Amino acid sequence: MQTAARRSFDYDMPLIQTPTSACQIRQAWAKVADTPDRETADRLKDEIKALLKETNAVLVAHYYVDPLIQDLALETGGCVGDSLEMARFGAEHEAGTLVVAGVRFMGESAKILCPEKTVLMPDLEAECSLDLGCPEEAFSAFCDQHPDRTVVVYANTSAAVKARADWVVTSSVALEIVSYLKSRGEKLIWGPDRHLGDYICRETGADMLLWQGSCIVHNEFKGQELAALKAEHPDAVVLVHPESPQSVIELSDVVGSTSKLLKAAVSRPEKKFIVATDLGILHEMQKQAPDKQFIAAPTAGNGGSCKSCAFCPWMAMNSLGGIKYALTSGRNEILLDRKLGEAAKLPLQRMLDFAAGLKRGDVFNGMGPA
């Protein structure tokens, strides 16, 4: 690990008012989907399977959505994955319609990469605190103050913010891309997640200015409470998503994207894991490693009303009923201005090309910003 060349948090930036707690959102957000009973769920799944075939559609789901939706995606030849895997799958699949079960920026990313396809979502109001906390006008004004810096944005942003960037990254490839840019002597603006940005800054030593956004789920993890839980389970491996605060990351055995955490849970020989990310990932972890124990990392503290509230209220808006509605009505479609989509595709495609290069081992062969 390297010492960061420059710690950020030293610039003027407008205070963006976003919800501060996943608990608060769940308590106030009436549209969080109810879990259907078994009979209703089975009926909806059968109807959706038929609709997917009739409409030449495929279901692409994130690890954080309802397990019923995750299982349905796999049963119908779709995809369950992290943001990078979802983007790859949608771009490569032959289906004319993509049903994206996740949050809005994921649907937008699918439309950016596949403008010729119809992209539907179970609920267009499924937002993301990182996206909401990084409005395009304010972020662009900040970037304009530092014209000498390369702009790197997390995938959890709007199409308009992506269009302002030089690079888009997911947590799966953020470290590698920033390391590459640092090797070229580039100074960076990073947005919007301050915890992920600070982690990358510490790991790479890159010169980064950080936007001050955060994920309302990962921001709730508490280092003190995690340390206490770790003391209760000294044999447990601690898996942490890098959107978590530094005090939590410092207690981790593995830091990484949802896919990396899932791989560690399955491949490592240990039998007990403490997991600091959205609880939705536990479904796939338990499926792939049924002989292992998974413990949710604590979010209690600062008045928290539950020991672990780590699930995204907007991801919870995705439902089987919403998928059926989108397929039968043709509504809940992601629509983007053509020029905006083209501008946003450049940095997003740059990431996908870089990620493909990682697999080939030739990531340094001319894949810098155009």
From Swiss-Prot:
Reactions mediated catalytically: iminosuccinate + dihydroxyacetone phosphate = quinolinate + phosphate + 2 H2O + H(+)
Gene Ontology molecular function, alphabetical: 4 iron, 4 sulfur cluster binding; metal ion binding; quinolinate synthetase A activity
Keywords: 4Fe-4S, Cytoplasm, Iron, Iron-sulfur, Metal-binding, Pyridine nucleotide biosynthesis, Transferase
A Gene Ontology BP annotation from the UniProt entry: 'de novo' NAD biosynthetic process from L-aspartate
GO CC term (a single one): cytosol
Cofactor(s) essential for the protein: [4Fe-4S] cluster
UniProt key word Lipoprotein: no
Main location: cytoplasm
Localization, UniProt: Cytoplasm
Protein residues bound to iminosuccinate: H62, S83, Y154, A155, N156, S171, H241, P242, E243, T258
Binding sites annotated in the UniProt record for [4Fe-4S] cluster: C128, C215, C312
Pathway: Cofactor biosynthesis; NAD(+) biosynthesis; quinolinate from iminoaspartate: step 1/1
Transmembrane segments: none
Family affiliation: Belongs to the quinolinate synthase family. Type 1 subfamily.
Purpose: Catalyzes the condensation of iminoaspartate with dihydroxyacetone phosphate to form quinolinate.
Listed name of the protein: Quinolinate synthase
Species whose genome carries this gene: Neisseria meningitidis serogroup A / serotype 4A (strain DSM 15465 / Z2491)
Lineage, opening ranks: Bacteria, Pseudomonadati, Pseudomonadota, Betaproteobacteria, Neisseriales
